[in-house]
Amino acid sequence: RASKLLGEDITKDEKIEKLKLIAKETVDIRGIGFYTLGKKRKSLNEQEKKRYAELFEEYFLKSFSSRLAEYTNPEIDVQSKEKLNENYTIVNSILKATNERPEIKIDWRIYTKNPENPLIRDLIIEGLSLARTQKEEFASVLNSNNDDIEALFKVLEEFSKN
């Protein structure tokens, strides 16, 4: 669906809004969010968890949709898939090269606990996990601010505003 959408002749802002809707249906935003928070999630109270989940969703949707909206007519070739266990399947794919960009290897980590509603949990692009990278960035913010969750909230809010 996203690939088809990116080929449509609509404005970048329209693409971004439609991509956000697709992401809400196909990506486990909450699961990724709490993974990226690392061990800090265990020390949050319910109110902080709720606030974090809301801020992370805004952050994720903006980051994801604005990056993808740059692509036009992406062609993705699924190479293989491997069921890791009851909960996860890895789908290996290639984003075909164009005049503007080289071929890119993308592995999709799919959460399949509910087979009726599989959700994307991570993208591994050229061997680099986006979720793990995000987790490291958030850990760095927390480490630089005496493990204060408010500092991370502020970073997420600032990103979403701009």
Regions inferred by a protein language model and the residue ranges of each:
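Juxtamembrane/interface motifs at transmembrane-helix termini
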Residues: L37-K39, E70-E75, S140-L142
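Early exported N-terminus immediately downstream of N-terminal targeting peptides
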Residues: R1-F64, L68
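Short loop or secondary-structure boundary microenvironments that flank
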Residues: D9, E82, I124-G127
